[in-house]
Every structure is written in C-alpha cells, then in structure tokens.
UniProtKB/Swiss-Prot annotation:
Origin organism lineage: Bacteria, Pseudomonadati, Spirochaetota, Spirochaetia, Leptospirales
UniProt-recorded Gene Ontology molecular function terms: pseudouridine synthase activity; RNA binding; tRNA pseudouridine(38-40) synthase activity
Keywords for this protein: Isomerase, tRNA processing
InterPro entries per record: PsdUridine_synth_cat_dom_sf, PsdUridine_synth_TruA, PsdUridine_synth_TruA_a/b_dom, PsdUridine_synth_TruA_C
Catalytic center residues: 26 (nucleophile)
Record function comment: Formation of pseudouridine at positions 38, 39 and 40 in the anticodon stem and loop of transfer RNAs.
PANTHER family documented for this protein: PSEUDOURIDYLATE SYNTHASE (PTHR11142), TRNA PSEUDOURIDINE SYNTHASE-LIKE 1 (PTHR11142:SF0)
Keyword Transmembrane helix included in the entry's annotation: no
Pfam families recorded: PseudoU_synth_1
Name the UniProt record assigns to this protein: tRNA pseudouridine synthase A
Record-stated family: Belongs to the tRNA pseudouridine synthase TruA family.
Organism from which the protein derives: Leptospira interrogans serogroup Icterohaemorrhagiae serovar Lai (strain 56601)
Binding-site residues, substrate: 52
Length: 207
C-alpha cells in the first residue's frame, strides 16, 4: 500500500532512512520502498484504480498451513461458469446489491470494472484467485461479489447470473459475505505518476 507524507528537511539518503523507519515500526508492518514525488501527489485521491485478489482454496480437506490465509471451500465449483460470470462484470455497473447497506449513506454505487479474471495457482492445487481491478470499490463489495459468484458456480443459483443480481439493486438477492481472510490488496495505480510503478516491481510474492 502506498502512503505519502511531508518532511521538514530534505531526505539525503533514502536507503538509510528506510532502514531507520523499519527499525521503529510494528512487527506486522514493513516499509519496502520509497521515492520522492511532487507536492500535488496524494496517495488516496491521486489513485485512478485499485487491484485486489480473493483467494479460494477449493479442496476436499482443509490445509492447516493455509488457515486464515484463504477461504477454504470444499464444494464443487463450475470453473467455466465462474469465468463466464467474471466476464459479465467488465465495464460500468451499479453495485448497490453487492455492498454493505449501512455503508452507503447516499453515496454513488456505480463503479467501473477495468479487469477481472480467475487465476489458478501453479504452486498449490485447488487455489483459485479472483483478480479484480476497478476505479473504486464499495464496502464489502469484493467479499459479497465472490460469495455470490460461488453460489452461482456451485449450482445453488444456476438459473441466474450476476448481471440480474446487479440489476435488482437489492442486497438480500445477492449471496453471502465471505470472511476478510482471503482478501488481498495488491496495488494502486497512478496514471499521472508513472515513476511510482517501480515500487511494485519486486512485489511478486503473491504470484
């Protein structure tokens, strides 16, 4: 995750400063890289799109070493159907039915899905990654979306599709909210600040 801050003095040595910061951070936090940007940059509002992944471990038995890192799902998944549903999501849609109702409070629920696909892990059999990039997300949107897609692709909702659920604009029509573990923030995109891209070049640990 990218954050920005201002300093009263010029940082002469980024590498040394990075080591110093990591020496005082909590054990659950690590700062991996840093660079200088102009004063107009804002890590939140300068962002054009964000990318997330939701990991599903589709195996008959759970894997203890993956507990709380993926959502274990032992039921059959119709993968071609799941991939077809993901394709339907591309473009601009109203995601009111896939958001936590209490979080809306008059906010726009229209978002644009720029890219979405299913990736099968080569390292772990049964591990599926729903990869989604959009210009913005609603509260719990990805977790509700993935839960809904699982219900469609396992046959529970075989006679409907995700577009029909979106058009209903009714949260009660959609599926369950999957747990937060399994959801990973991958990166933010800053089209006006291409120099930031290099900060993600070494982040291949989720591939």
């Amino acid at each position: 995750m990218i954050v920005n801050f201002k300093t009263q003095r010029v940082i002469q040595n980024f590498s040394k400063f990075l080591l110093s910061l990591n020496a005082i951070t909590d054990s659950g936090l690590s700062i991996l890289n840093m660079t200088e940007v102009d004063e107009n940059f804002d890590s939140r509002f300068s962002c054009n799109s964000r990318e997330y992944e939701y990991w599903i471990l589709n195996t008959k038995y759970p894997r203890p070493t993956w507990k709380n890192r993926t959502f274990w799902y032992q039921h059959r998944i119709d993968v071609p159907r799941l991939e077809a549903e993901l394709e339907l999501l591309k473009g601009e849609h109203d995601f009111r039915s896939l958001a936590k109702v209490a979080s809306l409070k008059g906010r726009s629920t229209v978002r644009t899905i720029l890219d979405v696909k299913l990736e099968r892990s080569l390292e772990l059999e049964g591990l599926l990654k729903v990869k989604i990039r959009a210009n913005g997300f609603l509260h719990n949107m990805i977790r509700i979306l993935t839960g809904t897609l699982l219900e469609i692709s396992n046959g529970k909702r075989k006679d409907t599709n995700v577009l029909e659920i979106l058009s209903s604009k009714d949260r009660t029509i959609a599926g369950i909210t999957l747990p937060p573990y399994g959801l990973y923030f991958i990166r933010a995109y800053y089209d006006s600040y291409p120099k930031i891209d290099f900060m993600y070049s070494h982040l291949d640990f989720l591939k």
